[in-house]
Amino acid sequence: MRNYLVISDIHGDKAGADLIQEAIDLHQPERILLLGDVLYHGPRNDLPNQYDPKAVIAFINSLKTPVTAVRGNCDAEVDQMVLNIPITADYNCFPLGTRTLFLTHGHVYSPEHLPVLKAGDLFLYGHTHIPFALQAGGIYLLNPGSVSLPKENHPRSYGLLTETAFTVRDAAHHKYQSIVFEDAPAEL
């Protein structure tokens, strides 16, 4: 069964990169889905405690697991110049079983401004730094939260996606939120 690690909003935080490496080691994903805001903390966010964009660049560029990424509102052309993965697309989509998986950061497309999707499709986004897993109007709205700068008293977090479910895990790798997709067998 496919197993994807879903991460968002690293914001140049070495501690966020370390959490991602722990999650890779623990879950052995076949692919990483990176939902933007990779290196820069942005003018509205506090500086992460371990702000070290160069360390995050080295980490991302050393990943052996394939990465599919989209651009966040804090990502710029200069970031693309130093990263060896494409990060300039506002969205990416591909099939996951019978569903369409739509990846975006959340500042262009959002739950309030969805692309055309059909019932059962998966809309993955970051941007809010708030983990979220809900079905609304037949579409699954999935947000892994932030590995570096969580908001509204949520923990640092990441997501795990399979063809049957989405689970948000906290920095201790405990299940924080989850949703099983309808018409999908429950995971063991």
Task: Indicate where each model-derived feature is located.
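Asp-based, Mg2+/Mn2+-dependent phosphohydrolase catalytic module
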Residues: 183-185
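Structural motif
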Residues: 6, 33, 103-105, 124
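Catalytic phosphate/metal-binding cores of nucleic-acid and nucleotide-processing enzymes, i.e., regions
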Residues: 4, 187-188
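Core catalytic region of metal-dependent phosphoesterases/phosphodiesterases
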Residues: 2-95
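Short, well-ordered secondary-structure micro-motifs
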Residues: 44-46, 79-82, 89, 113-114, ...
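Conserved beta-sheet core of the metallophosphoesterase superfamily
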Residues: 100, 107-177
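Generic secondary-structure microfeatures
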Residues: 71-75, 98, 105-110
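Fold-independent oxyanion-binding glycine-rich loops
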Residues: 9-10, 37, 73, 105-106, ...
